[in-house]
Amino acid sequence: MSKKIVNPPRLQGLSRLRVRPKREKNTIPCGQEMAALLGCWQNHGGQTDTAQCANLVAALENCMKTTHRKTKSENTINYHLARLGKLL
């Protein structure tokens, strides 16, 4: 015997379809260089113009010049879900 489903279940309509963005790890560019420089300043009595930390200052400046910030690309999936939601 085969069973017939009289009333198939229906999904509830969603008012808005949205996807939550991924949480990205906050990576600090040049963070290691900055931490090393701050540690050097702390070890030398808080003086920021010491000759011992000059190489770390140069490394941090070089890192800041060469590092480019990534531009955040806009996610288009929410746009497509909004259009699809009108059809459902």
Swiss-Prot record:
Pfam families: CHCH. Residues 27-71 form the CHCH domain. It is found in: Mitochondrion; Mitochondrion matrix. GO terms for biological process: mitochondrial translation. Keywords: Disulfide bond, Mitochondrion, Ribonucleoprotein, Ribosomal protein. Disulfide bonds join 30-63, 40-53. Its main location: mitochondrion. PANTHER family: 37S RIBOSOMAL PROTEIN MRP10, MITOCHONDRIAL, SMALL RIBOSOMAL SUBUNIT PROTEIN MS37. Component of the mitochondrial small ribosomal subunit (mt-SSU). Mature yeast 74S mitochondrial ribosomes consist of a small (37S) and a large (54S) subunit. The 37S small subunit contains a 15S ribosomal RNA (15S mt-rRNA) and at least 32 different proteins. The 54S large subunit contains a 21S rRNA (21S mt-rRNA) and at least 45 different proteins. Component of the mitochondrial ribosome (mitoribosome), a dedicated translation machinery responsible for the synthesis of mitochondrial genome-encoded proteins, including at least some of the essential transmembrane subunits of the mitochondrial respiratory chain. The mitoribosomes are attached to the mitochondrial inner membrane and translation products are cotranslationally integrated into the membrane. This is Small ribosomal subunit protein mS37. It comes from Schizosaccharomyces pombe (strain 972 / ATCC 24843) (Fission yeast). The gene is mrp10.
